[in-house]
Swiss-Prot record:
Family assignment from sequence similarity: Belongs to the galactose-1-phosphate uridylyltransferase type 2 family.
MF (Gene Ontology): UDP-glucose:hexose-1-phosphate uridylyltransferase activity
Entries under InterPro entries matching the protein: GalP_uridyl_Trfase_II, GalP_uridyl_Trfase_II_CS, GalP_Utransf_C, GalP_Utransf_N
Location (main, coarse): cytoplasm
PANTHER family the record matches: DUF4922 DOMAIN-CONTAINING PROTEIN, GALACTOSE-1-PHOSPHATE URIDYLYLTRANSFERASE
UniProt cross-references to Pfam families, sorted A to Z: GalP_UDP_tr_C, GalP_UDP_transf
A biological process term (GO) from this entry: galactose metabolic process
Protein name: Galactose-1-phosphate uridylyltransferase
GO cellular component: cytoplasm
Organism: Streptococcus thermophilus (strain CNRZ 1066)
Amino acid sequence: MAENLVNTFVTQVIENSDYEELDRIYLTNKVFTLVGEGVADVETDSSELIDLKDQLLQAGVKAGSVGELNEEQDIIGAQLMDLITPRPSVVNRNFWDTYKSNPEQAIADFYAQSKRNDYVKVKAIAQNIAYKAPTKYGDLEITINLSKPEKDPKAIAAAKNAVASDYPKCQLCMENEGYLGRINHPARSNHRVVRFQMEDKEWGFQYSPYAYFNEHSIFFYGKHEPMHISPLTFGRLLTIVEAFPGYFAGSNADLPIVGGSILTHEHYQGGRHTFPMEVAGIKEKVSFDGYSDVEAGIVNWPMSVLRLRSEDKERLIALATKILNCWRGYSDEKAGVLAESDGQPHHTITPIARRKDGKFELDLVLRDNQTSEEYPDGIYHPHKDVQHIKKENIGLIEVMGLAILPPRLKTELKDVEDYLLGQGNQVAPIHQEWADELKAQNPNITAEEVTEVVRQSVADIFARVLEDAGVYKTNSEGLDQFKAFVDFVNLAD
């Protein structure tokens, strides 16, 4: 039975917050302030809070009181959901009061709140295409990212004309908490940050709005300072996995080409997800002089990964620091490895920390951001022949075996499927050579098989992407070159 939309939304706000029935008129007027009184008589069959919020926005657009751009609607939507979101002081007090007796419950409650108030965009994330496919490195995870709405040309034009602002300085800054938002900066009225201390400095813990995996979290420094991989990084990551049970924590590299999309603000990512790289075995055990108590090995992975395990955090930090310092100064001309050129450093590490079976674990992924005439985008970056699938930087998440592919692939891969079935002659020019190869390999392909064939090929290409990004190749020569670096570490003071 249809009910009044505003009244139903207010009822849900009262049920999901500290507001009481006596606050109904006040809340109703808050809603009218945001979406206009023209929605007063709209009815609904829904009782889900986020659905009701979306219907209020649609009704406001229809009534002319809410703008048509996604960005304008997001600003108002976040304010509507802020009505059920406790103040930052309350969020933090609740988190740490619960944490004292049950850290897992504190984390679960904060995650539930972040979904309930639509900060984590559960409905949007559900639109992503996601699957696993076997490769010689184990199952890789493939996602086509459809959760973030593509920019409307009107929004792009509006952003160009918007008044310039450097507040907040970036999308990770603490000042985003409760920020209204604007055309060129996301709405954050319903955003909350849990504060915690590392090294006697304030850090923030939040969830990612457009999560790429379960409980995708961000841990960021309270001040706007650039990313930097250092001995402190290893200690912080291990502190995080100790403080947040069941979570991994990792950092993007701190150099262009091999780094993430945000290098201007020190931050790490984490969450409750087992990535393909984590379950990859050890290809060859190695040892480091003076660290017989630390298990070490080269991981069976397309990128160049050293895995260290120990019960002692400080021993892991010390060895990881030695490896980082050695890698930053290491060159091997035959292997195509160069520490620096013209004063520009090329070497860094993508580190990932876990706590498993009573031990701390660090994966150190060796990175090199050289370019050349043949590979202007990066020698250890997806090469031209695979850029039709992935041309962006290979950051932390991809390093671990989860491909984040662009929205364009949804329609482009469907066109490739139709082409293989003889139902269409058009594929995007960047896919033509690949589509012809698939057609030659599968001349009698059926409609029942075609999606799986294309998806498997995408996974195989992603494995090649990771091989391109690997400094040492996965053949015997590459293994010998990798072990030569281990020997170099052992010779260092």
